[in-house]
């Protein structure tokens, strides 16, 4: 590998680590913490709990057959995609949207989508901290980054959806960094 490419790669890796290591200003972190509290209340709402419970009990065949490759080919106008923001849980998320919230999506225990504000980049988030941490009963806060699906500089927070005293799914919400300031 040429030295210039190696240096460029090293710089990119350093920049990524710097972004992830950067702590938020305490005033901004306080706003993120307040959003986390609000989102935990959403995750306990009967509409979201019911949607996750139903998803976990019986995954529809069209959802079971969905793959990441196929998901990427679907447009936001596809009836399959629209079903996730038009269902009752999707409408609940829409009712909670503010200028600070850039995205929100609800996943079942399997990491597959139950509802969202807008089509997500990935069909499943299983195996990623934003889903796995809430599934262990913890909240999660990601780094500030440019989100693939929204194109905005945001950070994501995630909370468990509790059903029967146990984590049954996850609720991930993207917060617009510029609107938190």
Which residues make up each language-model segment?
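Bacterial N-terminal signal peptides that target proteins for export
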Residues: 1-8
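Proline-rich, low-complexity intrinsically disordered regions
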Residues: 3, 18-19
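Bacterial N-terminal signal peptides
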Residues: 8-18
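Boundary of Sec targeting at the N-terminus
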Residues: 21-24
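Extracytoplasmic/periplasmic sensory segments of membrane signal-transduction proteins
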Residues: 26-121
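Structural recognition of the beta-strand scaffold that forms the well-ordered cores
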Residues: 105, 170-172
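Extracytoplasmic/periplasmic ligand-binding sensor regions of membrane-associated signaling proteins
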Residues: 116-168
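Helix-start (N-cap) segments at beta->loop->alpha junctions
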Residues: 173-181
């Amino acid at each position: 590998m040429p030295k210039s490419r190696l240096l460029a790669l090293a710089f990119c890796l350093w920049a990524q680590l710097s972004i992830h290591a950067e702590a938020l200003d305490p005033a901004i972190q306080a706003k993120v913490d307040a959003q986390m509290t609000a989102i935990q209340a959403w995750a306990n709402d009967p509409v979201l709990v019911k949607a996750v419970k139903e998803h976990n009990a019986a995954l529809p065949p069209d959802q079971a057959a969905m793959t990441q490759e196929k998901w990427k080919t679907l447009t936001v106008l596809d009836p399959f995609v629209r079903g996730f923001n038009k269902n009752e849980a999707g409408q609940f998320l829409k009712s909670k949207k503010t200028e600070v919230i850039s995205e929100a999506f609800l996943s079942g225990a399997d990491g597959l989508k139950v509802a969202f504000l807008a089509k997500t980049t990935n069909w499943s988030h299983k195996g990623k901290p934003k889903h796995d941490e809430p599934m262990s009963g913890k909240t999660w806060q990601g780094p500030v980054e440019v989100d693939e699906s929204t194109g905005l500089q945001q950070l994501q927070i995630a909370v468990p959806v509790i059903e029967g005293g146990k984590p049954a799914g996850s609720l991930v919400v993207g917060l617009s960094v510029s609107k938190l300031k």
